[in-house]
């Protein structure tokens, strides 16, 4: 599966909250759930080997969970052939998951 057009958002707590809010409300989001998951992964990777401040450190487990759940959702929903050939730009994880992640940030 090839990557999406990257979401153009800075790697900040406010952006993470905004991205998760868009995930919970995909009809009003400029980004797909795939783009949101990929953005979460890039955010996490940026701080992988860096001592980030506490605000960022507290976000990282949630961001990792978003990306991991995206992968698991696809693997548990689609065949290997579909995973290799489809782009999943229109696929959506359950909105409730995004609401749960947002509640963990509160």
Predicted regions, residues:
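Acidic, Ser/Pro/Thr-rich low-complexity regulatory regions
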Residues: 1-106
């Amino acid at each position: 599966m090839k990557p999406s057009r990257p979401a153009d958002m800075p790697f900040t707590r406010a952006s993470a909250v905004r991205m998760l809010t868009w995930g919970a409300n995909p009809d009003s989001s400029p980004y797909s759930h795939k783009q949101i998951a990929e953005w979460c992964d890039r955010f996490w990777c940026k701080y992988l080997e860096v001592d980030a401040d506490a605000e960022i450190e507290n976000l990282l487990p949630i961001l990792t969970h978003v990306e991991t759940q995206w992968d698991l959702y696809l693997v548990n929903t689609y065949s290997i052939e579909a995973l290799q050939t489809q782009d999943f730009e229109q696929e959506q994880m359950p909105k409730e998951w995004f609401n749960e992640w947002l509640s963990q940030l509160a």
